[in-house]
Amino acid sequence: MADRQRWVIKIGSALLTNDGKGLDCALMQTWVDRMVALRERGIEVVIVSSGAVAEGMTRLGWSARPDSVHELQAAAAVGQMGLVQAWETRFQQHQLHTAQVLLTHDDLSDRKRYLNARSTLLTLLGFGVVPVVNENDTVVTDEIRFGDNDTLAALVANLVEADRLLILTDQEGLFDADPRSNADANLIREARASDPAIVRVAGGGGLLGRGGMATKVRAGKLAARSGAITTIASGRSPEVLIELADGQGPGTTLLPDTTPMNARKQWLAGHLQMRGRLVLDAGAVVRLREGGSSLLPVGVVDVFGQFSRGEMVACEDERGERVGCGLVNYDAADARRICRKKSAEIAGVLGFMNEEELIHRDNLVLMEAGSRVSGA
């Protein structure tokens, strides 16, 4: 193991609460003890912690989870106090401090705020503080929601350039079939995060997909973009942390590709909300994938959605498969007017020309083939 590593550890509500009814402080103490042991081995730790809503419900005396978004946000606000206090109290027993970091997708979609969040987290780690990260449920809306803490943890792993993302769950890892209905199901010990077959296994219907394994595999793909190894493992015992540090292999390990994206493209790839879609002809797809070119308007056959200059759009081929995503140089109305046109014709059509490309290659991230694009 390298002299110093950095791990992002995502712990779900089921591993921190008493059946969803408030925090299990004794169990949290065990988690903290094991994370302190990791630090003593030279492993920096960032925690992505669930449990705020469950703790808030207990403090408010609610026996049933509310349906109202505002009530859930209120519970999260109340519970976040208890969650942070619980982590801080237990780390202080080891003379360590924690820091609360609440994020929304907007924080990571804006380049300046992204860099500020990164600088803050790295500064905290430099001071020996343990960051405790969660989504800012009190103010978040559907438009800026990460959707789940697995995705948030992956983006944090990219943000701090973690060596490992550890997603702890109530399952042993990813199986090649549903182990609850198939006694012959085998645990997948290791795979490439970019392997499309892994996504199909995790989300190809049945209980595995509904149980959230698909989101964990997608998080592994996202974390792999910065070179992080992802391990999906059972968190029923906090000893899993020590086992992994000892080089043992519980769970499923998703390996990154050999060349991680540079910092800017990591940020671009972290945009989960696309403001629109550009449909590319076959020639444009080949030029992007094989030649590393910018996207010119002549290669765009259709434009969907409403977006402004500088916003993130998805690029897809004519079969609807993801090619990439990037920051567009023209708004939706202008993009529709210049699609299928040569760059030399832009000024004549619009009366001006911002750039000769619809998306410059420096602002474009290519995706592996076989990924469907959701409608914009």
Curated annotation (Swiss-Prot):
Gene3D superfamilies: Acetylglutamate kinase-like (3.40.1160.10), PUA domain (2.30.130.10). The keyword Nucleotide-binding applies. One of its GO terms (biological process) is L-proline biosynthetic process. Keywords: Amino-acid biosynthesis, ATP-binding, Cytoplasm, Kinase, Nucleotide-binding, Proline biosynthesis, Transferase. It catalyses: L-glutamate + ATP = L-glutamyl 5-phosphate + ADP. It is found in: Cytoplasm. Pathway: Amino-acid biosynthesis; L-proline biosynthesis; L-glutamate 5-semialdehyde from L-glutamate: step 1/2. Pfam families: AA_kinase, PUA. SMART domains: PUA (SM00359). Substrate binds at residues 50, 137, 149. Belongs to the glutamate 5-kinase family. Catalyzes the transfer of a phosphate group to glutamate to form L-glutamate 5-phosphate. This is Glutamate 5-kinase. It comes from Alcanivorax borkumensis (strain ATCC 700651 / DSM 11573 / NCIMB 13689 / SK2). The lineage of its organism: Bacteria, Pseudomonadati, Pseudomonadota, Gammaproteobacteria, Oceanospirillales.
